[in-house]
Amino acid sequence: MHPLPEYPRPSMRRDSYVNLNGPWDYAITQSSEFPAKWDGAILVPYSPEAKASGVGRTLQPGQWLHYHRTFTPPAGEGGRVLLHFGAVDYACAVEVNGRLAGGHRGGYWPFTLDITDLLRPQGRNTLWVAAQDPTGTGTQARGKQTLRPGGMFYPAQSGIWQTVWLERVPENYIDTLTVTPDYDARTVTVKVHTSKPGGAVNLWAVVRAGGVTIAEDWGSDEADRDGEVTLNIAEEHFFPWSPDSPFLYDLTVGTTQGEEEGFDTVHSYFALRKWECKEDAKGIRRFFLNGRPILLNGLLDQGYWPDGLYTPPSDAAVEHELHTVRELGFNLLRKHAKIEPERWYYHCDKLGIIVWQDMVNGGGAYPMWYVTYLTNALQPLMRRAPDGKLLWGFLGRGSAHSREEYARELADTVAALGQHPCIGCWVPFNEGWGQFDARKATETLRALDPSRPVDEASGWFDRGGGDVHSIHNYFYPLRIRPNMRTVALSEYGGIAWPMPGHEPPRKTYGYGTARSRAELTEHYCDLQRKTVLPQLKKGLSALVYTQLTDVEDEVNGLFTYDRTAIKPDAAAVRAVNEALEAEFEKAVKA
């Protein structure tokens, strides 16, 4: 049985699929050369630092992590064979049968290699991956990974950490699929690029709702040969997506290019929904979803697991966690300093969970005493800190190379996740970590994706741009004032309690403490009812409590690290969320 056997890319699904997760040979060496011997077996897709990998070793900067296995290509004849990696942290080279297939840099983004011409006509094939990860010694996106974990920073992880798979495709296959719904026009535009660009592409598309075909275009018009079609959604089949009704349309797309080129078919889905930031009936700026003001009430989600670090134990575990989030009455998760495997976003799409997506922080080393601790203590002053290259250097972006690297990572993130309806806001920077020229980042995001709000600088070093006035507040009285932007309390709370019966932290970390379940419940409910709720009528429109789960030493989650227990009383949490929603509805009424 393969770990994580589910098809890993729900937004572009094919029937041909061979999962390569499972035991591989591994070795950690000081050289990029093929190892003379193997150190043992590693369970892919778990990083060697993770218990679930069976290895339990930390890859150091400068070392090489080697993987090796044999494989049989997908059944069938002809066409091309593609090798997909969900993510490899950070840089890797890939060889098939001793010949270079390609490589990749970037620890959070998928990549694909066409290995057809490297395959043996008969027998088994060999696959070798050599990876390196500089962690904190580089400038690449790394999130909260560190070689010296503690407090709010967690163990580094390296190498393959998402599913590896093969598929057989036609000679001229669909390389990229872009699906652009238009809520106001009641349409969806489908565009493909194929592996052999430049020629005519005869495209067809079928939209289904609840298994019933509601729109189709079979590529009969000359206009369809440019690889793009637009389909109309009739009024009787118009079902907007929202947390209360997360309706997804099924989409099947194909190309018809004759026997030589083959016929490619992929399956996808989409939703119709519209985000706006505008004034409510009382002139206060709010988030609007599908023309209605909405309270975004959620949790900070860091995406770590006790045995797998970045990689979950199973798809069912992910789905269960997200179901519980909805059952508790939350409609938002802020995905913090990490990009998840695509199936995580797919489950959010299905369950109606809105996601605020952080760009994964990187850059050179920055002094945490200044960037986080001093800045937190002097928030009003730091919000006015002058922008420019001097500050960028303090924040780890002194080099032009690092800034260019961030621009590529930002574009890759939007390309990888932009088609998921659950994504409700982009967050280019958090608390100044690797921040530079935030206004430009916002402009870039709006050019890449004009359909979503931007929280330009979550926490501090605010430049006044974007759509959100984003506040982190753990220690001070909360005073919300009307703003030209929509106001979000994008981090707060963080009450720590190490729940008995679960693995204790090395050192308890949080923002305030509780001594029992009853005390944690009381502190949480008092914070929400007495501090947060009165601010809703003053303009507070989004809440992100810290946090969803315990993570390593940070025991301030609503769930335990292993997700087996909810720490505060679940009924009390639901009741508080209902009270917040009721107060918000009163606040936005004319």
Language model regions located:
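Substrate-binding/catalytic cleft of secreted carbohydrate-active enzymes
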Residues: 323, 332-577, 583-589
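Secreted/periplasmic carbohydrate-active enzymes, especially glycoside hydrolases
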Residues: 1-347, 351-355, 409, 424-425, ...
